Amino acid sequence: MGRDEEAAARAEAWNHGFGFIKTSVIKTAIELEIPDILHNHGAPLSLSALSSAVGVPPDRLHRIMRFLTHHGVSKKTASPPGESDYYYAETAVSRSLTKDNLGAFVLLQGAQRGPSACITAQGLKSRERPGVEELGSDPLYEDPIFTKMVFRDAMACHARLTTSAVIENYGEGFRGVGSLVDVGGSYGMTLGMLVEAFPWIRGICYDLPQVVAKAKPLHGVEFVAGSMFESVPEADVVMLMFVLHNWSDNECIDILKRCKEAIPRETGKVMIIDAIIEEDGEGDEFAEARLGLDVTMMAVTFEGKERTHREWAFILKEAGFRKYVVKNIKALESLIEAYP
């Protein structure tokens, strides 16, 4: 290894060592609403004005903005003639971190700090599903305000963005669909968006009784309580969004068998919306996020995971599906059409 390669390797090692700082700074920027302020202002904003807006001294804020600019979360612009103040503008990345975009989801990832939110050497060595004593608990989840606001908002923003991607890039897939059941559909936000976009669909939101009991009425959506391990309501299409990555292969096969029983053999299909990992870990611009999500699932579910094409093919075949087609919806997740 030459000196240049060695220096580059050491620099990369330093970057890994300080990797947590990036998450921390971006989390703080979201809490201070910096992405929203830059977006709503609509033009470059001075450091002094931004300092007044967020309540952080200019000398400290300058260092934070310098860090954010290095990572593309803001853009330093030229100062007006006669001014010496720093000016910052939004970027495509900062727009993605606003409250109406992925801000809440990124905030959740940065907020978690308990044993269940990280990978440990001991956890990787264990072959047993961890109990509460081993896994520990994140005090954040004992805080009702956190659970209600941060966690709920994070899950909602993720679902909203993915559903929008489905509507925009898979609209033709809903032609001729008379009924659709969303398995694990929670309070029906995703299904409500789909029914609004494709009003000819009769939506069935299927979840556990304790979830359905708290759901508010939605136009075009019927709420049904039950367990996906026992049965699934009959429909033209069964949808599983962010569901199967929580479960082991055997559990996924059981769930998919119940879904297969619920659709017409000749015309029905199961829609799976989850990430697909490339065999070599490479891929498009979402590749790193998918790998990170896979490791997260290993930490918080033990047997859950993001699957490769080969792994998806295996569980679909074992569940009795004769073929499947992968659709690119230009998101972290892909859409898999599975046919009985």
Swiss-Prot record:
GO terms for molecular function: O-methyltransferase activity; protein dimerization activity. Expressed in leaves. The keyword Transit peptide does not apply. Keywords: Methyltransferase, S-adenosyl-L-methionine, Transferase. Nevadensin is a selective inhibitor of human carboxylesterase 1 (hCE-1), a key enzyme responsible for the hydrolysis of a wide range of endogenous and xenobiotic esters. GO terms for biological process: methylation. Its EC number is 2.1.1.-, 2.1.1.232. It is an enzyme of class 2 (transferase). Pathway: Flavonoid metabolism. It catalyses: scutellarein 4'-methyl ether + S-adenosyl-L-methionine = ladanein + S-adenosyl-L-homocysteine; acacetin + S-adenosyl-L-methionine = apigenin 4',7-dimethyl ether + S-adenosyl-L-homocysteine; diosmetin + S-adenosyl-L-methionine = luteolin 4',7-dimethyl ether + S-adenosyl-L-homocysteine; chrysoeriol + S-adenosyl-L-methionine = velutin + S-adenosyl-L-homocysteine. Pfam families: Dimerisation (PF08100), Methyltransf_2 (PF00891). It comes from the Eukaryota. S-adenosyl-L-methionine binds at residue 207. The active site is at 245 (proton acceptor). InterPro entries: COMT-like, O_MeTrfase_dom, Plant_O-MeTrfase_dimerisation, SAM-dependent_MTases_sf, WH-like_DNA-bd_sf, WH_DNA-bd_sf. Belongs to the class I-like SAM-binding methyltransferase superfamily. Cation-independent O-methyltransferase family. Homodimer. Flavonoid 7-O-methyltransferase involved in the biosynthesis of polymethoxylated flavonoids natural products such as nevadensin and salvigenin, aroma compounds which contribute to the flavor of sweet basil, and exhibit pharmacological activities such as anti-allergic, anti-oxidant, antibacterial, anti-proliferative, and anti-inflammatory effects. This is Flavonoid 7-O-methyltransferase 2. It comes from Ocimum basilicum (Sweet basil). The gene is FOMT2.
